[in-house]
Amino acid sequence: MTSLAAGKPAPLGASYDGKGVNFALFSAHAERVELCVFDEQGNEQRFDLPARSGDIWHGWLAAAGPGLRYGYRVHGPWDPAQGHRFNPAKLLIDPSAHRVEGDLPDDERLHGGMWQPDRRDSAAVAPKSQVVDLRYDWRGDKPPRTPWGETVIYEAHVKGLTLLNPQLPEAIRGTYKALGHPAMIAYFKSLGISALELLPVAQFASEPRLQRMGLSNYWGYNPLAWFALDPRYASDPDRALDEFRDAVKALHAAGIEVILDIVLNHSAEIDLEGPTVSLRGIDNRSYYWVREDSDYHNWTGCGNTLNLSHPGVVEWARQCLRFWVDECHVDGFRFDLASVMGRTPEFRQDAPLFEAIRRDSVLSQVKLIAEPWDIGPGGYQVGNFPPLFAEWNDHFRDSARRFWLQQNVSLGDFAQRFAASSDLFARDGKPPSATVNLVTAHDGFTLRDCVCFNQKHNEANGEENRDGTNNNYSNNHGIEGLEANFAVIERRRASAHALLTTLLLAQGTPMLLAGDEQGHSQHGNNNAYCQDNALTWLDWRQANPGLTAFTAALIHLRRRIPALTRNRWWQEGDGNVRWLNRNAQPLTAAEWQQGAACMQIQLSDRWLLTLNATAEVVDMVLPEGEWRAVPPFAGEDNPVIMAVWHGPAHGVCVFQRS
């Protein structure tokens, strides 16, 4: 290995062809790029990348292969005023690497310098990129391609979901392998979900601040290598990629889609005081949004913001998404703080990355879900994403919680959210599935905590309970905490059932947080991003089987109601929906404006939801016909025909007309 051939500019990253490895790196402002390879003893050998095509630096190294450890040193101007922070003393991770060896330590040698370059060499402590052979036997794999109208999403953390499941072999608990194990697949199938949405599995790092407190980043929203499977979730770190692909293949065989939470908005380099380990040293001005004072626009709250309007960065991001679809066969993405993807810097529906996805024949066909906000100016964009995207709907979450737990939202607002928030999404040709309905998610209270806590309890996060939202719209039903008397426990159970029924029988795409169906609590912590412990791990031995069965019955019931699966907007008089009062009469204009009270929702003519959000028992006259309560509100062979429902406080029931 004495010199490199010219190689080719695509694809980005390190590509093994059986005879050698092609290296390609985007940097618009670099003046020279050195490829640094390391032997088993850590000895470094450097090669200049000999060719440049546009802004792609590239070269081909003969006789190199899988397992080769490498990094880059990138030469260019040190000119913070112009956004340039090149520093060849810093060994840099390939942003398209398919494996990264080593964690990101809290070590000053990784710092690139604030206003003057830090000349200390970082190679001894910097994580190393590694060449990977991407070949895999996908024979027999068939993506489920579940229609949006039939999709039920289950949001889960690989480790938190599986670590304490006694049905799994101990050696694979907490790993990718566990996801594809027959015991987990049987659980998913019995529950009825159609898509498993995983919190980030691309390699991430723990912030230095957390490391100093003895904590770690648990959720994974601090990306270090966007194209690399995080080895911490592998039973064998050397096989992380294949273990993940094995799980995807097994899930597909069971008809379950896999959606990845992807963090295309910031990097683990944090702010100017953070480490220089990749993008900052490769081309700071291109990869990040840089302010006139040379600091970063912090529209993510994480110290920096990716500039996904730059053509080179757009292509890098597109190739990242294609890697996950082409090489890992994932079925879609949930984009964290997705407004960043549309910034130019103002948000636009035709932003470069959105257009690149729309034009891509593969990416335009997978499921795309946006978290439609960031913390920058104009960052809240619910309902404004391009038609290809579904969006998390916080209006639904807040309205459902306020209806059942606060009793301070009108029937009209609740009905609007129940009917797929047509005021937000019935435009640009979007279907009702464009709203991803949720009552809880990984951030915020769990379902159980929504009915047990009025206040957040985040002291364990080390920020004196300042972190996490204060707008929880929760209700502890008179006693703060999990312990309560029988009467309070019953009220909590009724409220949890009502919220689950609202979520799973509303129009739109429902998303269930893993553990909500088991009664999992985080003891009031509504921002458990740094709690890799029993607070966040699902305790399967303590799961509530009655609540699990209730949830599963609702999901299976959902699939029987055409108004919920056809994915068409409800229109006046089309037979899909009727909104009725407690006397089975159409709601009046005055009743629509009432705060939380009683209503009946008739779906597809034969199905009826009765809702009593008051604190009193209410008799509700059912519409004309013979109505029987159905599971999970009655047994399979329920013979009781009702004309009046004696609705308990905070109660809900579903009926079918004979």
UniProtKB/Swiss-Prot annotation:
Gene3D superfamilies: Glycosidases, Golgi alpha-mannosidase II, Immunoglobulins. The keyword Hydrolase applies. The record marks D443 as: Transition state stabilizer. It holds the Pfam family CBM_48. The active site is at D336 (nucleophile), E371 (proton donor). InterPro entries: GlgX_C, GlgX_Isoamylase_N_E_set, Glyco_hydro_13_cat_dom, Glyco_hydro_13_N, Glyco_hydro_b, Glycogen_debranch_bac, Glycogen_debranch_GlgX, Glycoside_hydrolase_SF. Pathway: Glycan degradation; glycogen degradation. This is Glycogen debranching enzyme. It comes from Klebsiella pneumoniae subsp. pneumoniae (strain ATCC 700721 / MGH 78578). The gene is glgX.
